[in-house]
Amino acid sequence: MANLTRVGFVGDIVGRAGRSAVIQNLPKFKREFELDFIVANAENASGGFGLTATNAHELLGCGIDAITGGNHSFDKKDVVALMDALPIIRPYNHFAGTAGRGVINLMGHYGLPHTNNAFLEAERALKGCESENILIDFHAEATSEKNAFFRLFCGRVGAIAGTHTHVGTDDLQILKGTAYVSDVGLSGAFDGVIGMDSEAPVKSFLTGLKHSFKVNEKCRRIFQMVVFEFDDGRCTDAFKIRVIDGVSEPLVQRAVKFI
């Protein structure tokens, strides 16, 4: 008999809008699709930068089993203590001595703070990993880097879910038992620029000067999650769910399957 496991992965949760979208939508989808385990990237969940203890407990209380991160993982000072007490994961290739358990959440190189090589660190992590169903959150800027990572580990892990850009991509696929999507996309403000109020980013592009980004609070929200179905370590099915305020039905996209 098939040993099926269903895992939900929620893309970058950004600010209050993202948390409320998750709290409103995740419990019903957990029941509907009988999810066994849920992972979410929450490095932007508190004001768009980092994760506080209060917000971590809030998200874990609505059904999330593990929280991943990226370049904003350490933006809030209380997160170090949280990593010792709660299922909050730092990028595995963060420098040695950094807090956190380092289960497979990796950070890319291009356009991000310097870390150890994600490709080499992933090889090292897999050698010591005894889990049957392996899901990697690859938090990276460049789709080319994510694609190269997928090609290296295709057939060796169950799923690779890209995060960081906040913009969902249309390339969900399954090849050699490995599901892949370049970016799941944010859960947060649908209006604005990658979850932030539009004014500051637009000014930055117009003037070339830095402006303080603020989370867009008065907005339509979007919730985005990919569901992976694993059978003995291989992904056999995957689909993405999008829920947007004002759109009556959830939008569902199934993975393209290749032999």
What are these regions (language model features)?
Residues 1-259:
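Acidic, metal/ion-coordinating pockets
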